[in-house]
Amino acid sequence: MNNSINHKFHHISRAEYQELLAVSRGDAVADYIIDNVSILDLINGGEISGPIVIKGRYIAGVGAEYADAPALQRIDARGATAVPGFIDAHLHIESSMMTPVTFETATLPRGLTTVICDPHEIVNVMGEAGFAWFARCAEQARQNQYLQVSSCVPALEGCDVNGASFTLEQMLAWRDHPQVTGLAEMMDYPGVISGQNALLDKLDAFRHLTLDGHCPGLGGKELNAYIAAGIENCHESYQLEEGRRKLQLGMSLMIREGSAARNLNALAPLINEFNSPQCMLCTDDRNPWEIAHEGHIDALIRRLIEQHNVPLHVAYRVASWSTARHFGLNHLGLLAPGKQADIVLLSDARKVTVQQVLVKGEPIDAQTLQAEESARLAQSAPPYGNTIDRQPVSASDFALQFTPGKRYRVIEVIHNELITHSRSSVYSENGFDRDDVCFIAVLERYGQRLAPACGLLGGFGLNEGALAATVSHDSHNIVVIGRSAEEMALAVNQVIQDGGGLCVVRNGQVQSHLPLPIAGLMSTDTAQSLAEQIDALKAAARECGPLPDEPFIQMAFLSLPVIPALKLTSQGLFDGEKFAFTTLEVTE
């Protein structure tokens, strides 16, 4: 666990120190004082009463001794509880389908003052240009948007076609950027364990920063070796004992609750007073509909308190201080003298009801964020341009021939999990022996002119129609599932025409579609508009059968080879346990 102070992120001049100290001593006037407030003590438990004194970006003092201190402005908290701003320990903003600017508008008023982001979705599509845009957005954001340098582009070498490379030389060019906190999730864990020099070179280059992991279900000697390489955390744990073992071996545990991967219920029982400094919260991938209707990190805190009886100070600790310590962000995570004034005022701490948010010492106004969003997005110079280099397809492109009596591999979906199971199904003249089997195909979209890779999918719940998307981790080729080749072709052609996006087809017609003009991943619409469009897509998808709660996010992970057990990439059917391609027909 990285508990060191990373001085790269704590910029305060000597003049600022002198002004801050003068206010702390009571010799100068504060910029803001928050009165009538109780501060949740994340270290000892309980509460601290008394004002919070702010000078510039920082907290100058806390407690009753400042009751009569002078200030330019006073904020009446009306009896609210103050907690540190929430921190998401690991996410891909692109998966929200919002730009970083829109994401900030949607989440900052909910108390999310800091994010640790890996932009490997857009980097897989357009390389360094995508990372550069995220850095520009982070530089101008009010929200603390930190970046982990994407380590695996593509996720696994030789297993898929993606849009760009991101070389070690390019990665090193960003290592010292003020918003960079470390190396993003090292997904090729077999390569790390086997000591591949190219991967160890990346780890060595970023060893003074934070090294993110990715090792779902890993245990035994392999887990020991992965940690021995220097990997410090994992957000992919989905079983209680798996999480416990990782904590025992010194890993920090990121407890994830996204739109598709929902691991909080499984892992929350691990959290206690002793290990909470090594536990963090993250969303990984969360869509705008859920953010609007349920929340972000605030929703995870609420569930820890209400459903898992986690004490208040521990629940808020894992949502802020634990993550700040892990990433060496010593200026964040506590409401204490010298810390950055990222403050969330709660009218109800148990229900996580946000009353007001301050970030870097300034109150946040949601309407101002919305009003400035368009101009700030333009200022960031988004990388527009069609990233779909694929000709329209026809039904014949998805034709598969099956022999009666033969057995075929089926990717079996587990609702609300990213892992899949591998099963087999026998084909007869009447079809497959289980009626949940539908078709899946992945089409590379980067001009390689490859034929679609086709396979079989079970457990998804698709009874009719087709769904297609260019959000398909991590290479973001076109993924389509359907009951008929004709409707699959129609759905694919719609997302090609849109320059990327999501589509639902049923009864031979496009029922709903959402264009994603930035890299085929993100929209430039407002968060509210996006949430409404997602609602329409989900409603159309539900007409196709009893699908997962988030069908497009669940579908997006069916082509990610670094999560077991069976996946489909643009290169073919991939066994995520043996880390090797396999055949559709079962021959052994």
From Swiss-Prot:
CDD domains: AdeC (cd01295)
EC number per UniProt: 3.5.4.2
SUPFAM superfamilies: Composite domain of metallo-dependent hydrolases, Metallo-dependent hydrolases
Cofactor(s) for this UniProt protein: Mn(2+)
Domain of life: Bacteria
GO biological process: adenine catabolic process
Keyword set, alphabetical order: Hydrolase, Manganese
Assembly: Homodimer.
Protein name, UniProt field: Adenine deaminase
Organism: Escherichia coli O81 (strain ED1a)
Gene symbol of the encoding locus: ade
